[in-house]
Amino acid sequence: MLLRTASSFSLLKANADHILPLPNSSSSGIIRYSQSLGKNLVPCATKDTNNRPLTGVVFEPFEEVKKELDLVPTVPQASLARQKYTDDCEATINEQINVEYNVSYVYHAMFAYFDRDNVALKGLAKFFKESSEEEREHAEKLMEYQNKRGGKVKLQSIVMPLSEFDHEEKGDALYAMELALSLEKLTNEKLLNLHSVASKNNDVQLADFIESEFLGEQVEAIKKISEYVAQLRRVGKGHGVWHFDQMLLHEEGVAA
């Protein structure tokens, strides 16, 4: 769309219709003046006789898109959606997917332990099962984002977790919860590293994704499990563990 100069104002003359260009102006406006009203000039609107377009086109889509068309891959194996997505960011996301799956696997092992008939701490079993599912959802969310940006998901091996969580001094509940707190802090470090990689590669979209989907939630999880650890340290290994377990059993949304 072309912009044209607005119509200029002019001054009327009653008995004569002299037309002069605007003084000290490069515009094409005119001045009409009159003496019928004394020496005062009466301003009025008049149409410019020379409607010249302004220069400076903001956006020329068909010209600018030419360079983008050259970037669209023609090889069948190449992603069509990929744009400003570095190999470094792609690899780090695959590493984070592996972290989330490994943590999920450990939590699932904890769920299986506390669900045993000779342990029977159903609240802790519920907590770690929900935590395992949440970490798996995190991994899947990262996989979806990887595909969205045109990267390739490469799943890596998962380490076999422990099957026994009883501790001679701390007991099983406190030991497992302290382990969970360590895992959440480790996951947070990995997420911060992923955010750092995104920033170094000027990938604002990846940085925003990590900030909005993971970092805030991770802080909340660390706070919640820290409180659980503090409470279990107070109750020791005795009857208080059962009361703590009942609290988790009847609490909604207890997963980290």
Curated annotation (Swiss-Prot):
GO terms for cellular component: chloroplast; cytoplasm. GO terms for biological process: intracellular iron ion homeostasis; iron ion transport. It is found in: Plastid, Chloroplast. Its EC number is 1.16.3.1. It catalyses: 4 Fe(2+) + O2 + 4 H(+) = 4 Fe(3+) + 2 H2O. It is an enzyme of class 1 (oxidoreductase). InterPro entries: Ferritin, Ferritin-like, Ferritin-like_diiron, Ferritin-like_SF, Ferritin_CS, Ferritin_DPS_dom. GO terms for molecular function: ferric iron binding; ferrous iron binding; ferroxidase activity. Fe cation 2 binds at residues 135, 184, 218. Residues 50-82 are annotated as: Extension peptide (EP). It comes from the Eukaryota. Fe cation 1 binds at residues 100, 135, 138. The keyword RNA-binding does not apply. Residues 83-236 form the Ferritin-like diiron domain. Residues 1-49 form a transit peptide. The keyword Membrane does not apply. Stores iron in a soluble, non-toxic, readily available form. Important for iron homeostasis. Has ferroxidase activity. Iron is taken up in the ferrous form and deposited as ferric hydroxides after oxidation. Oligomer of 24 subunits. There are two types of subunits: L (light) chain and H (heavy) chain. The major chain can be light or heavy, depending on the species and tissue type. The functional molecule forms a roughly spherical shell with a diameter of 12 nm and contains a central cavity into which the insoluble mineral iron core is deposited. Belongs to the ferritin family. This is Ferritin-3, chloroplastic. It comes from Glycine max.
